Structures are given as structure tokens and as C-alpha cells.
């Protein structure tokens, strides 16, 4: 038993899979480098086409992350929304079904009255003690993005299995120029996604749980 994402570990895969959720406010408890290293090592077990493993992790913690957070907050105060290396697609560019899911999420935020609070914690990088910024070379195969998604998902699952919470978010990478300066990320690489890691706090934002589509709308069988 135990409480998900707050230090307890699990061996049951179904429990890990169904209990993991996005943590939007982390506690002040630090995460050791050994745990972070093991999380990345485990994530590397994700499947990769022809074993390309076209990914790299820049892990920001302590003073470096504090400086990045301060710059993000300063830019937010100026109204600078930034733009990630992969851009920000407009909602209308997504399918009708995806737009329905997005609307449901925004309705949930509105119903809970936490929209403004959520924007604030995003600017603070969710108060995470560690953020993994995941990159791959510019011009890499589109298949490599699929691999990187698997790597990211595996990272979040193994983090939860080790008692940590996580969230993968666009807002973590919306100021790539700041990240390149502090983490020495070359211009030849795209900063694809960030994954915040840490221990879950008691904040009510962490009680937000989205629903998943019914399987009958997701899968089509041949008869």
C-alpha cells in the first residue's frame, strides 16, 4: 500500500500504471542524484527503432534550476510566453476528438477554480527539485520522436515506482534560449520536452485527475 508518489515504492505494474498522474506542485524534499541517475537508466530501457536511442537528458537541479526558475518567472511577469523549439500548435490544429479532450480538461480546471493558480505554478516549474530536459538532434527522423515519447513515458513510470511524482510539460521548455545558456545545450539539438521530478506535495492541484477515453473509441478490431 502507501500513497502514490510520496516516497513509497511499488512492485505491481498495474498499480503503477493506474496510479501515476501529473504532479503540479512538488514538495521541498530534494531528490538524490543517485535516484535521478537510476531513473534515467531505467528510462533507457524504452524500445527504440534499430536501437537508435536518439535522446539525451540534461538534468537541472539545485542552483542551476533555481536560476532557470528565476528567469522563467521574470519572463512571465513581462508577459513573455516564449516559444519551444517544437512550437506551440493551436488547438484548432488538433483532431475533433483531441479538442473534446482538451475542452474537458479546461472545464475541469474551471470547475475547480484553479486556473490562475495553475498558471503560477507552471511559471515556477511546478516547484520541482529536478527537471529532466530531453533533447534530440535537429532533423532527426520522425520515428525518433516516437522513441523519445516512449523514453519519457518510461521515465515517468519508473519515477513513480521509486516513490516520486512527475509531470511532462510544454511550459518547461518554452524558453529554450534560457535552457541553452544554463545547460550548454547545443543549437544542433531540439529541446523537445521537460519532465519535472520530485515528491508530491499536499497541494489541491495534485488532486486534479483527468479521465481517459473509453477503449471502444480507441481501438478498432477487424470484425
Residues of each region from the PLM?
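Short, Lys/Arg-enriched N-terminal segments with co-localized hydrophobic residues
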Residues: 1-10
Amino acid at each position: 500500500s502507501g500513497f502514490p508518489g510520496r516516497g513509497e515504492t511499488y512492485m505491481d505494474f498495474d498499480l503503477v500504471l493506474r496510479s501515476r498522474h501529473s504532479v503540479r506542485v512538488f514538495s521541498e524534499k530534494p531528490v538524490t542524484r543517485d535516484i535521478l541517475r537510476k531513473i534515467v537508466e531505467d528510462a533507457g530501457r524504452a524500445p527504440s527503432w534499430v536501437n537508435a536511442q536518439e535522446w539525451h537528458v540534461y538534468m537541472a537541479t539545485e542552483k542551476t534550476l533555481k536560476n532557470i526558475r528565476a528567469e522563467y518567472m521574470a519572463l512571465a511577469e513581462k508577459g513573455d510566453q516564449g516559444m519551444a523549439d517544437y512550437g506551440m500548435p493551436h488547438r484548432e490544429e488538433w483532431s475533433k476528438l483531441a479538442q473534446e479532450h482538451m475542452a474537458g480538461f479546461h472545464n475541469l480546471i474551471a470547475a475547480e477554480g484553479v486556473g490562475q493558480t495553475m498558471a503560477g505554478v507552471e511559471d515556477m516549474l511546478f516547484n520541482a527539485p529536478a527537471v529532466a530536459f530531453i533533447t534530440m538532434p535537429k532533423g532527426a527522423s520522425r520515428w525518433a520522436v516516437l522513441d523519445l515519447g516512449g523514453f519519457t513515458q518510461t521515465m515517468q513510470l519508473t519515477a513513480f515506482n521509486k516513490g516520486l511524482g512527475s509531470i511532462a510539460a510544454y511550459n518547461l521548455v518554452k524558453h529554450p534560449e534560457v535552457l541553452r545558456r544554463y545547460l550548454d545545450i547545443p543549437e544542433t539539438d531540439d529541446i523537445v520536452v521537460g519532465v519535472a521530478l520530485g515528491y508530491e506535495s499536499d497541494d489541491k492541484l495534485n488532486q486534479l485527475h483527468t479521465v481517459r477515453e473509453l477503449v471502444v473509441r480507441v481501438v478498432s478490431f477487424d470484425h
